[in-house]
Regions:
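C-terminal structural segments of small proteins and small subunits
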Residues: 52-82
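Short, charged/polar N-terminal "headpieces" of proteins
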Residues: 1-22
Length: 82
């Protein structure tokens, strides 16, 4: 799975052979969360959370918002339209 961004110690990845809508998986420390990107304009929204604290999710969300454009470009490069 391509890592498209690193946020603190967490990897932001798009799984190969994944499905629409455009989304990313955030992994690290035994936790995983999935965020819909809502490309091209956002804002990203949490879809699933497995183990991240609310505070950590807020940190992740701020970084996803700040890096939305390159993540949407990465999704489009792998899968086409959002």
């Amino acid at each position: 799975m391509p890592t498209i961004l690193t946020i603190f110690a967490w990897r932001v990845a798009i799984y190969p052979n994944d499905h629409r809508p455009a989304h990313v998986h955030v992994l690290g420390g035994g936790c995983e969360a999935v965020f819909h990107l809502r490309c091209p304009d956002g804002p990203p929204v949490l879809r699933e959370n497995y183990g991240f604290s609310r505070g950590d999710l807020n940190k992740v969300l701020l970084q996803l918002e700040a890096h939305l454009a390159p993540m949407c470009r990465a999704w489009r490069a792998l899968y086409g339209d959002f």
